[in-house]
Amino acid sequence: MPKRTLQGVVVSDKQAKTVVVRVDRRFTHPLYKKTIRRSKNYHAHDENNEFKPGDMVWIEESKPISKLKRWTVVRGEQKKTA
């Protein structure tokens, strides 16, 4: 079974070797047929502390690393600065 991969935006990098990633999803409400946005935060392992808030990253499921971390950062794109 392949590992799940999610795309999200780094919200926080205040913990050592950990980033908090916000993953947004959109779905249609079954009764009202309105498109709804929901988001969820995931704690992900960032070995080299290379990602900062605002960066787009892809996270992949992994074995439990700590109490909250079950995801690792696979790759990412640095936020463009002007």
Swiss-Prot record:
A GO molecular-function annotation: rRNA binding
SUPFAM superfamilies named in the record: Nucleic acid-binding proteins (SSF50249)
Swiss-Prot/TrEMBL keywords: Ribonucleoprotein, Ribosomal protein, RNA-binding, rRNA-binding
Domain of life: Bacteria
KW GTP-binding (keyword) present: no
Keyword rRNA-binding attributed: yes
GO biological process, one term: translation
Family: Belongs to the universal ribosomal protein uS17 family.
Subunit and partners: Part of the 30S ribosomal subunit.
UniProt-recorded name of the protein: Small ribosomal subunit protein uS17
Species for this entry: Nitrobacter hamburgensis (strain DSM 10229 / NCIMB 13809 / X14)
Gene: rpsQ
